[in-house]
Amino acid sequence: FYRRKSKKIVDYFEKTSQKVDRAILQQTGAYFKIYKFNSVSSFTNSRLWQQCNFKYHNFAKIDYKSCFDSIYTHAYKWCIEKDTVDSKEASNANLHIVIDRVLQNINCRSSNGLIVGPEFSRMIAEVLLQKIDVEVKQNLAAQGLNAGTDYRVFRYVDDIYIFSHTQAHTDLIIKTIEIAAQKYLLKFNEFKYLKANTPVVLSSWLGKARALSDRISTLFYRKQELHDMVDKKPLLKSGYISVDRIKDDFIYLVNEFPKEQRYIVSFMLSTLLNNISNKKDGYALFEPDKCARAFVLLDLAMYIYSFCPCFEHTQKLISMIVYMDDELHFSKDELNHKKLINLIRRYSFVFEKGNMNDLCNWFVFFHDYSVPLLRNTEAILEKKLREEDNPILWANYLIYSRYHSDYHKEILIWVEELLQYKVNQIGSKDPLLQKEFWYVITFINCPYISGSVKTALEGIVRPMATAAETNLANKIKKIIAEFLLQNKSNLFFCWGYY
């Protein structure tokens, strides 16, 4: 979708995906290497998992209850200050104490819990969790259990997988982990405690999901099949597509494994996207006179997506449509454009009931492809926008509203009134630290707002640009202010593309 927007983003993605598993990159947005396994599923499908299932007789799975929320930032001082009960008594000023300060500063000075989401939180959590791992290994060795011989323990973030020869060993390992974790205020989730004899299958839903995924994949030719053909054919095979049967089987799967619904939806959308994305290697998706079949696939994708319309799944679905646009020319072909609009409107309930933050990229897509929603749907979205109080959502929706000049003027009036209100709410002291400042950095370069509103936004920023550089904080404020006051359409928010 962003290929037309920024070549640099695409180039970066292509280079990064050569180093990192592309599926992991698309699913998590993780632009780094995770070693040794990219995900739990890659671990449970590995040779190491199989070997442990053959070598050991007992298996157990436990996890830390509300792991990130339970991590006490002062625990990082305790990691290196032995016998320190009150963290204020910690005197060793090193990395662990700095971590404590940083974590509190990004969490409103609270020492309870790590912010869930940022990869920084996961990295910092590993410092503490690996400290516990080392203690457990040493304590078990002192009790006569040797890692790799008597047992194997694997941890993926807060999930712990235990293999041992006897149930007694398993119980001892769990007790040892529990004692070590309690020192840092971490507890087990008693509702997710699993014991079993090997070989063990953790994801019973996965086999059935793979079977359905394979059925979907049979609708397409594999690249190797096309490569070996004398007469080149499109990726999508000719013949009847039993969409209703696939939908029914999908519902049965979701109903059987309701707790895995998000993963099942992700699996099926990835299957469709992976097959459709083979187009990038120079293959056609459809025969020239059978492009109508595209809407059968899109309807299937929208149906699956409607069960879990999260941000990740939104990106996958939009990507499918953009791949198809090369052959269907939604913006130029009047019939295909109308079919796309009808398809989107048929699933209006997704946008009416979904989380706005998960749906925000749809608004930019709708603008690019001239897709107006139903008026009833827009009324619901407008109400949600007011409740969310999110400048990014307002910016995206303002872009969407441009499909009709009168509607755009209406939304713009609301936005300008909101901006003026936010400016008036910002105090003169430390505007950067105030929530309303997000509206300033989002809309300061907006090409649609009036001159008076733009001047009001700049009035918040200019004092920072002219303040004396008496300390590091003022220098940083000046850099930010000079960046925001540039006469450019693409700053914090890239208005120049729209």
Label for each model-derived stretch:
Residues 1-93, 97-116, 120, 473:
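Conserved two-metal-ion catalytic palm core of "right-hand" nucleic acid polymerases
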Residues 10-16, 88-97, 141-154, 189-195:
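Short, glycine/acidic-rich hinge or "gate" loops at secondary-structure transitions
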Residues 50, 58, 62, 97, ...:
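Right-hand nucleic-acid polymerase module
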Residues 164-188:
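Helical (often loop-to-helix) elements that flank the catalytic cores of nucleotide-handling enzymes
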Residues 182-217:
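Conserved catalytic core of two-metal-ion nucleotidyltransferases
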